[in-house]
């Protein structure tokens, strides 16, 4: 019997990150997956990052995880989302070549010391007296370990739906995990069903590209990994088109044939990634919905039409696709489908992602009720690090909400649970002004160095960056000017006699940065990346104290009673999701409202303000 410290089941994004993290920590690790080609597969959209999600990728990278490096290797278009807004809510995103990503993932796994790849089907968890002991494979061979990480994605009792047709599978061309799912039942884990979906894949040559608006990447691409500066692969454009009233008519007339609207699906789907059927029904007043046509790779014939996931029959899929501009002669190479799967209520987990009632069993990814590669990878990292620490007899890691988006997600999952697939948004974080994508390394890399998961290359690069940053920060804070001196240099500020440091001037967006840098012959020579970081820190420095006070105020006001007749529908600042859940739960206090799934700090602040205003009026 082969013996390991940690066994990871599943080679998707959570599994790869978990296995790599455990191995980096120096424990003997096995990654069990059915096929070598499964490693790093992008089952749905060919992209990494986005709003909130890009923050997670940066945090993974700061702890020497691999998703950011893989995305940089396979990225064929890079865009910084929300570029016109503040850095706190900007999100790096990359269109990825599926084949390049999968190849890079397999290569990085093969090259990791202390990590063994085992090809086979996981059939049964072995345990005795409340402790995991190992894993039995479908060929009856056994692997021994006291720490096992389940990263099964959509494969636990996975069921694909295309119209009236259903079959067992976790994704197109794959199988499902029935025997492993059966071995979980005696553990009395709180199980539920969720669903996700994917659109049909269209042959590239059947699209009329010339009739469509092209969307190129950024001229100055922003990489995910702090170790990279430029893309490795050639860059391409995507295209944009839209549905129309004819598209919507075809869908409405065939809703009964949709697996979801025909009553064949029990699982709850992701609220913020609705199927095209959902869009047509829920947003009946909209005449069109945007579709991004995303190439699946440099040499791939397939295009991913982002925005039209579906469970309609194949003939209806073809009909509505061909009603869309640019797709009039489209050929579908693979139909869209919905997939249902088992998940575990994450409230059954500790913050380490270890199951509370079975020592040594960790869960990560979609099995915990999340959706998205990035959320899965971040959980994989947490589970991998904690499984390794447990194997070493060390204390578990705790990621706090004030420290990282990873901490926000883990806390949301393990304290609030999920009733629908969980997706990360910047609005979920109380401290989002300080939890930015640009400073993830400053927040987390020292932490990673302390626990031992950061390699020498990153340690050296981070040390050099912080040496240069600290020198620039010290210089910017020590050099100051009077209003008169600034006026002579063409910079006008209030003539109040107060000296202003270069750091304070960088925070004033109305003053061109070049003018500020020209004031000092040392600062102007600094690396542009260091200056960008310095300017961003200066900008948010004035707000972070207020952010902390706001968060503390909410904590102090948790006992505030919410009137039974409180009208949530009248609050224009609340999302429809929160209005529905607040009306459903009718929380008695602000603390009870805070524990509702999907609740945000901004929503709590709004509710508190309305209650206070009402109290003042009645006084």
Swiss-Prot record:
Required cofactor names: FAD
Main location: cytoplasm
GO MF terms, alphabetically ordered: flavin adenine dinucleotide binding
Keywords, alphabetical: Cytoplasm, FAD, Flavoprotein, NAD, tRNA processing
Residues annotated for NAD(+) binding in this entry: 269-283
Gene3D superfamilies assigned: FAD/NAD(P)-binding domain, GidA associated domain, C-terminal subdomain
Coiled coil: none
Residues reported in the UniProt entry to bind FAD: 10-15
Alphabetized SUPFAM superfamilies for the sequence: FAD/NAD(P)-binding domain
Gene Ontology terms describing biological process: tRNA methylation; tRNA wobble uridine modification
Cellular location(s): Cytoplasm
Pfam short name (any one): SAM_GIDA_C
Record-level GO cellular component terms: cytosol
UniProt cross-references to InterPro entries, sorted A to Z: FAD/NAD-bd_sf, GIDA_C_N, MnmG, MnmG-rel, MnmG-rel_CS, MnmG_C, MnmG_C_subdom, MnmG_C_subdom_sf
Role summary: NAD-binding protein involved in the addition of a carboxymethylaminomethyl (cmnm) group at the wobble position (U34) of certain tRNAs, forming tRNA-cmnm(5)s(2)U34.
Subunit structure: Homodimer. Heterotetramer of two MnmE and two MnmG subunits.
Recorded family membership: Belongs to the MnmG family.
Annotated HAMAP family: MnmG_GidA (MF_00129)
Protein name per Swiss-Prot or TrEMBL: tRNA uridine 5-carboxymethylaminomethyl modification enzyme MnmG
Source organism: Paracoccus denitrificans (strain Pd 1222)
């Amino acid at each position: 019997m082969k013996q390991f410290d940690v066994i990871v089941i599943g080679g998707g994004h959570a599994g790869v990150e978990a296995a790599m993290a455990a191995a980096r920590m120096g424990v003997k690790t096995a990654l069990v997956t059915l096929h070598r080609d499964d490693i790093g597969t992008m089952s749905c959209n060919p992209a990494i990052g986005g709003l909130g999600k890009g923050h997670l990728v940066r945090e993974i990278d700061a702890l020497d995880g691999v998703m950011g490096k893989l995305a940089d290797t396979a990225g064929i278009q890079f865009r910084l989302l929300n570029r016109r807004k503040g850095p706190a809510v900007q999100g790096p995103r990359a269109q990825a070549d599926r084949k390049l990503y999968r190849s890079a993932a397999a290569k990085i796994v093969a090259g990791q010391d202390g990590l063994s790849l085992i090809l086979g089907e996981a059939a049964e968890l072995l345990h005795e007296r409340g402790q995991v002991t190992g894993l039995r494979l479908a060929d009856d061979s056994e692997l021994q370990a006291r720490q096992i990480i389940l990263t099964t994605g959509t494969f636990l009792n996975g069921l694909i739906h295309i119209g009236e047709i259903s079959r067992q599978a976790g994704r197109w061309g794959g199988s499902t995990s029935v025997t492993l799912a059966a071995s979980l039942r005696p553990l009395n884990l709180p199980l539920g069903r969720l669903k996700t979906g994917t659109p049909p894949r269209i042959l590239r040559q059947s699209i009329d590209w010339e009739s469509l608006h092209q969307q190129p990447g950024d001229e100055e691409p922003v990489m995910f990994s702090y170790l990279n500066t430029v893309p490795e692969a050639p860059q391409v454009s995507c295209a944009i088109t839209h549905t129309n009233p004819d598209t919507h008519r075809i869908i409405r007339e065939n809703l009964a044939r949709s697996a979801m609207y025909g009553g064949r699906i029990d699982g709850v789907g992701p609220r913020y990634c609705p199927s095209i059927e959902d869009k047509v029904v829920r947003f009946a007043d909209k005449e069109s919905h945007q579709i991004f046509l995303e190439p699946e790779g440099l040499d791939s014939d397939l295009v991913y039409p982002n925005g039209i996931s579906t469970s309609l029959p194949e003939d209806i899929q073809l009909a509505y696709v061909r009603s869309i501009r640019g797709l009039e002669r489209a050929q579908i190479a693979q139909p869209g489908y919905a997939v249902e799967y088992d998940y575990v209520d994450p409230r059954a987990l500790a913050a380490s992602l270890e199951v509370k009632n079975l020592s040594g069993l960790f869960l990560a990814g979609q099995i915990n009720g999340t959706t998205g590669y990035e959320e899965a990878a971040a959980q994989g990292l947490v589970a991998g690090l904690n499984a390794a620490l447990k194997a070493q007899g060390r204390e578990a890691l705790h990621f706090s909400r004030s420290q990282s988006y990873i901490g926000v997600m883990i806390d949301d999952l393990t304290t609030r649970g999920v009733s629908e697939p969980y997706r990360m948004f910047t609005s979920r974080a109380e401290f989002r002004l300080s939890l930015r994508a640009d400073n993830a390394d400053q927040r987390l890399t020292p932490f990673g160095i302390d626990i031992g998961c950061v390699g020498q290359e990153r340690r050296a690069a981070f040390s050099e960056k912080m040496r240069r940053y600290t020198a620039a920060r010290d210089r910017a804070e020590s050099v100051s000017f009077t209003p008169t001196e600034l006026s002579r240099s063409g910079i006008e500020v209030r003539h109040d006699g107060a000296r202003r440091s270069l750091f304070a001037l960088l925070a004033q967006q109305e003053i061109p940065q070049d003018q500020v840098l020209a004031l000092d012959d040392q600062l102007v020579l600094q690396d542009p990346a260091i200056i960008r970081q310095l300017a961003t820190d200066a900008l948010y420095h004035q707000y972070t104290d207020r952010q902390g006070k706001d968060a503390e105020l909410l904590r102090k006001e948790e006992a505030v009673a919410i009137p039974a007749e409180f009208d949530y529908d009248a609050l224009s600042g609340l999302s429809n999701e929160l209005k529905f859940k607040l009306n459903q739960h009718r929380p008695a206090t602000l603390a009870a409202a805070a524990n509702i799934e999907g609740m945000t700090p901004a929503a709590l602040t709004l509710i508190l303000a309305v209650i206070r205003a009402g109290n003042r009026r009645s006084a």
